[in-house]
Amino acid sequence: MVKRGDKVRIKRKESYWYGDVGTVASVDKAGILYPVIVRFNTVNYNGLSGSAGGINTNNFAESELEVIS
């Protein structure tokens, strides 16, 4: 089970961050499909051209994460 602050590697192949390492920001206990919010140091491609905007968090299921030490 992952917990807040864990470093995790992303295993969801269709994710922009596949293979990258992020930090668990929170884990929702409400029984939703993707309860783990992971924060990354980089942003994705959603920013406008030439701007630093974009998203640096995403939700994942625990089965899509590998805890690293």
From Swiss-Prot:
Keyword annotations: Membrane, Photosynthesis, Photosystem I, Thylakoid
Q: Which Pfam families match?
A: PSI_PsaE
Any one of the GO BP annotations: photosynthesis
Does the record bear GTP-binding in its keywords? Answer: no
What topology does the record note for this protein and the membrane? Peripheral membrane protein
User: Matching InterPro entries, A to Z?
Assistant: Elect_transpt_acc-like_dom_sf, PSI_PsaE
Q: Which ranges does the record mark as transmembrane? A: none
Example GO CC term: the record gives: plasma membrane-derived thylakoid membrane
Q: Does the keyword Ubl conjugation apply?
A: no
Q: Which SUPFAM superfamilies match?
A: Electron transport accessory proteins
What are the subcellular locations of this protein?
Cellular thylakoid membrane
Taking the record's annotation, the residue ranges forming a coiled coil are none
Q: Which family does it belong to?
A: Belongs to the PsaE family.
UniProt function note: Stabilizes the interaction between PsaC and the PSI core, assists the docking of the ferredoxin to PSI and interacts with ferredoxin-NADP oxidoreductase.
**Alphabetical list of HAMAP family matching this protein:** PSI_PsaE
**Per its record, how is this protein called by name?**
Photosystem I reaction center subunit IV
Upper taxonomic classification of the species? Bacteria, Bacillati, Cyanobacteriota, Cyanophyceae, Oscillatoriophycideae
* Gene name, Swiss-Prot/TrEMBL: psaE
